[in-house]
Amino acid sequence: MLLGPRWYVDDGCHTEHLWGNKKKNKGGDDFPGTFEVDDFGAGVRCCSEDGTTCKTIGKCPGTASHSEAQEKCEGKGMRLCTKDELLTEICCKTGGNCDNHQVWTSTPEPSLLPFLITMYLTLVVIHHRINNDNVLKI
């Protein structure tokens, strides 16, 4: 699937280089954060409803789609963590080797549609003003 909604994916922890095996954990950002389509494979880290705890489901590198990850979290009475929650490092040291691998979040990619609609309407107004008055009034 090339088109469709995309969700934020990032490595499960960015501070693991500050603790543990320094040879294994060379840096804090193993993967840059990206937005991926549903069938991209990533690990599953779930947050409690109030966002105060995180649990890893399975192992990383993960192969779950976004839909599968959501189902796994819901099956545990939890939900996928948001991008903001993941970046607080709440999920560090919760297992599955996911500190160093990509995991799903519930954060969707911001849509360009509102921006494109605003730009289109702005151009329509400018065109109308130029054609009606021969003078651009802003």
What are these regions (language model features)?
Residues 33-55, 96-112:
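Short, structured beta-strand segments at or near domain termini in extracellular proteins/domains
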Residues 1-23:
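Secreted, propeptide-processed cysteine-rich mini-domains
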Residues 3-9, 53-69, 115-117:
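Disulfide-bonded cysteine-rich modules in secreted/extracellular proteins
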Residues 29-33, 66:
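Eukaryotic intrinsically disordered and solvent-exposed regulatory patches
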Residues 1, 61-107:
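Conserved hydrophobic ligand-interaction patch in extracellular adhesion modules
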Residues 110-138:
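Low-complexity, Pro/Ser/Thr-rich intrinsically disordered segments
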Residues 5-7, 39-40, 53-54, 66, ...:
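Residue-level signal for mature regions of secreted extracellular proteins and peptides
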Residues 11, 44-45, 52, 58, ...:
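Extracellular secreted precursors and ectodomains with disulfide-bonded cysteine-rich loops/domains
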